[in-house]
């Protein structure tokens, strides 16, 4: 919270006073502002976030069946001031389980129902097949039968996006809990933020995920059509097995890639100090890389996974990302991760314009004239969310205005000085 307060105070001073007159590196559409004075770069934030919820995950994709089979070990430390007598697990993909879920009922009410004419195969799900508590002595306690669905927000008993299980032995403040979870998931065919189309898979909110516990107990809501997410920081070590020859992009840094000899390859990605993990895979991506360099800052490797028909727009994607890294870094503090992955989703995938730690989806229009800010704007906006949502991890379910409001103000200000001045700010 101290880090959040420091950044918010920084907005009220540095962001109003001025910004650098240098254009972002390797950004051909960027023009240098002439009327805003340069200010010194703010120092990086000291230390990292508490690693409260840590995930070690193995997952295998079956693209023909559009399914995932996963196994994870969660190591969670109680950061609150009271004991935890139960757990909460988010199972977001159950929002697509049937038309009775709260998420789909809300989408229907607003007239934007992607499953209005869906076939049975179009739906998705997330099913926990095993839940085990690993005790300190290595023994295990099976909690599978204790896991049950809850709907604290709207009492919709058909909604299965949130589950709970009571613990026989409470987790005292400062103590740790280890859980082993096995599950299967199916991608919805038509999707919002996650799912599959053809051989393109974007995999987000895909694993059973703990809620947030504090001095008031659990903060864990059902999945709503107009809400996003909230979770603890932690360390992620994830192994994703996909067909050999398919490219993978994910949160964090790739550590290894192993051919399994059976037509599949396992990609291992690791990242600490993040509060979520998303990934994508497809055999059709083309890859481009560009380094973002700024004096006094660690280098950031920008990686772009692009649809082949959009290859001519690669530099414009990098321009948007570089503008965010430069100006947000000057105003709010440096981007703290070594990588940033930009995903260009295919036509009709409906997965564009969404942010996750160190990775986000952009979006390319059919017409992208040089005089427009597309695709630069959506890249700038989603890269900006790496600061406001990613590093300043507000509760997006209850206070979504915070990251969206500050990020929208900030990206509009960047547009007015670094891209085509099509916005009045």
Regions found by a protein language model. Give the residues of each.
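Bacterial N-terminal signal peptides
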Residues: 2-12
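N-terminal, polar/Ser/Thr-rich
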Residues: 7, 18-69
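Ligand-binding face of N-terminal immunoglobulin V-set domains in extracellular IgSF glycoproteins
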Residues: 67-95, 99-100, 111-113
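Extended, low-hydrophobicity, Ser/Thr/Pro/Gly-biased non-transmembrane segments
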Residues: 110-138, 148, 154-168, 178-285
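Acidic/His/Gly-enriched intrinsically disordered linker/tail segments
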Residues: 352, 404, 408-425
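Active-site His/Glu-centered metal-binding helix of metallohydrolases
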Residues: 379, 383-388, 406, 410
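Catalytic Zn2+-binding segment of zinc metalloproteases
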Residues: 383-399
């Amino acid at each position: 919270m101290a880090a959040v307060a420091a950044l918010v105070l920084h907005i009220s001073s540095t962001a109003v006073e001025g910004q650098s007159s240098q254009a972002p590196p390797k950004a051909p559409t960027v023009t240098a502002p002439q009327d805003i004075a340069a200010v010194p770069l703010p120092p990086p934030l000291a230390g990292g976030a508490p690693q409260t919820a840590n995930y070690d995950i193995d997952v295998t994709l079956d693209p023909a069946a559009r399914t995932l089979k996963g196994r994870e070990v969660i190591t969670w430390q109680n950061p609150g001031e009271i004991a935890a007598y139960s757990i909460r697990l988010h199972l977001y993909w159950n929002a697509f389980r049937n038309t009775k879920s709260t998420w789909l009922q809300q989408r229907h009410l607003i007239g934007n129902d992607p499953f209005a004419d869906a076939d049975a195969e179009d739906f998705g799900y997330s099913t926990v097949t095993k839940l085990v508590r690993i005790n300190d002595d290595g023994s295990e306690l099976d909690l599978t039968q204790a896991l049950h669905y809850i709907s604290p927000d709207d009492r919709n008993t058909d909604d299965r996006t949130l589950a709970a299980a009571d613990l026989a032995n409470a987790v005292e403040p400062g103590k740790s809990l280890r859980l082993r979870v096995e599950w299967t998931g199916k991608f919805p065919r038509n999707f919002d933020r996650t799912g599959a189309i053809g051989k393109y898979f974007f995999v987000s909110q895909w694993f059973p995920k703990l809620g947030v516990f504090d001095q008031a107990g659990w903060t864990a809501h059902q999945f709503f059509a107009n809400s996003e997410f909230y979770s603890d920081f932690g360390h992620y070590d994830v192994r994703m097995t996909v067909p050999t020859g398919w490219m993978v992009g994910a949160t964090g840094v790739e550590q290894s890639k192993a051919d399994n000899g059976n037509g599949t390859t396992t990609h291992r990605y690791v990242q600490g100090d993040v509060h979520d993990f998303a990934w994508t895979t497809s055999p059709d991506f083309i890859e481009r890389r560009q380094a973002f360099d700024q004096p006094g800052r660690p280098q950031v490797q920008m990686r772009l996974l692009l649809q082949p028909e959009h290859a001519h727009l690669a530099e414009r994607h990098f321009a948007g990302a570089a503008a965010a890294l430069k100006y947000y870094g000057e105003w709010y503090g440096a981007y703290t991760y070594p990588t940033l992955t930009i995903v260009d989703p295919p036509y009709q995938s409906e997965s564009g314009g969404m942010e996750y730690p160190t990775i986000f989806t952009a979006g390319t229009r059919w017409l992208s004239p040089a005089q427009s800010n597309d695709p630069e704007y959506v890249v700038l906006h989603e890269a900006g969310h790496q600061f406001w949502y990613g590093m300043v991890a507000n509760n997006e379910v209850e206070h979504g205005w915070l990251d969206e409001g500050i990020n929208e103000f900030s990206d509009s200000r960047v547009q007015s000085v670094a891209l085509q001045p099509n916005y009045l700010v």
